[in-house]
Amino acid sequence: MAFRVLDSSAFYAGIPFSSNEPSYITSLVYNEIDHIKKDHDAVQILIETKRLTINEPEEKFVTTSIDAAKKSGDFSNLSDEDISTIALSLQLGAELVTDDFAVSNVAKNLNIKVIPVMTDGIKNVVTWRYYCPGCEFDNYLISGASTTRSRIECPRCGNRLKRKPMKN
């Protein structure tokens, strides 16, 4: 029997409500789908019938997921919820149900099977190269840049970096 870890897009598509397979979410995803929980008792029923389990990934899997996200260049596009779903999938050896391209890219880099929900999913794994449109700074490693999840700034001039896929 395949275990699946769900991100919030699976709930928007109704996946957990139409499947009898056991599924897992993290507490961060559980909190993210709060507006769905308010409208439906279905999420609570899934938990009570053990078709949905809330589980937290171990720190070493979170760290591995963050490292993989930084290596692929996707880290700035991932939320804590995203990182937690990747980490839990890695820890459990579970399939990851998501439509998020950045989540899919990192998961596939970690050899996690990704199940898209309402899209065709990603075709190729990508490593992103960051560059500055202002001073033409170009480096796929963003460790020298000032990084936050909302903005990646050029270490030379402070402009917002853009990204493009690296040619393999």
Model-predicted regions and their roles:
Residues 1-6, 10-83, 87-92, 102-168:
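Feature 3881 marks metal-assisted phosphotransfer/nuclease machinery
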Residues 96-97:
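Conserved SAM-binding loop
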